Amino acid sequence: VLSQSIVWSGAQAQTDQTSEQDMRRALVGQSAYAACKMLHADYSQKRVDLIVATAIKTNKWESQKDWLKSSQATQTIQLVSEAMNQECTDFNQNSTQFVPAMEAIEALW
């Protein structure tokens, strides 16, 4: 299971009471998964963009589209995607990016 906080946030993002922080964590999780697939499974940029766009629409995260372009978002997505295992199903806890990725997720605001 990918980070429990990201998975939990993804489930919580479907409620009206979801905080902005929870939405951002869930969006980072979806985006990092897609970026990981681009790194390890040869997904095209178009396919990655479609995964993220579908997640935004399905989960009603439109309010976070601009934030997704921020340096905080892009850096966190990069760290998280690089900390994932080759299958993009979980974190590689031996990755040098693991601790920085966890810290970046916790720092989302």
Where are these regions (language model features)?
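Bacterial N-terminal signal peptides
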Residues: 1-5
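Sec/Tat signal peptide C-region and signal peptidase I cleavage site
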Residues: 7-13
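Short N-proximal segments of mature Sec-exported proteins
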Residues: 15-67
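Compact alpha-helical subdomains of small soluble proteins
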Residues: 47-109
